Amino acid sequence: MPGSAPTGSPPAIEVAGLSKTYGGQPVVTDVSFTVQPGSVTGFLGPNGAGKSTALRIMVGLTRPTAGRVAVLGGPYTALPNPGRRVGVLLDASAQHAGRAGREVLALSALVMGLPEQRADEMLERVGLSPAEGRRRAGAYSLGMRQRLGIAHALLGDPELLILDEPANGLDPAGIHWMRTLLREFADRGGTVLLSSHLLREMEAVADHLVVIGGGRILADGSRAELLSGVDGGLEELFLRLTAADTRAEVAG
């Protein structure tokens, strides 16, 4: 359960020297950064930058070629009942298409040792009606699947959320809802690592920004630090950094 993070708390996530290659091709190269408790950290980069690979390594779905990731003090896979401490949404389309939305949540609640009514509470929290909860997840729109995925991430009342593009498919009202939810989660002491292409929303909600390009960290700092003197805000910073990275690759 989120609560105020004590001063001097260790990082919620610590990534150190992370590298991953596929078939000899580097996808992530010597990536290091931390996610501090009680904050929203934005993880930004163009398509193919290595964001999703890094997130999959964090939660034990992909093995790194080198380096390590500590989630709440150790490997994610070593956490007992990890859903009670870390909420994860990497791919909203990965939900069982043949099960009703409520059933997806109720089964996970059972695995976590939570009462079945928790499924109903989470459906309400993310704005899915009881009737929508009885529909098969395969019949959901992308926006509804995203809401179900966020409900699943919140199911165990975790202290940390790891979310990959959770706003995909949400309409403007849904994006505003998600931004408010994440900001309130962090303000209550929770921690969020958020990957998103929605730069304006990221600028509005993130406390800290990590920009990745070509599998390497291009920038890492507080939002205030990185945007100081940048008239065009996060969009200008992002385009400037990624354009410079592209030029460096061409020159190399």
Tell where the protein language model's regions lie, with residue ranges.
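Conserved ABC ATPase "signature" region
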Residues: A106, L110, E116-E132
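Catalytic Walker B motif of ABC-type/P-loop ATPase nucleotide-binding domains
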Residues: L161-E165
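Conserved ABC transporter NBD signature motif
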Residues: G67-P82
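ABC ATPase "signature
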Residues: D220-G221
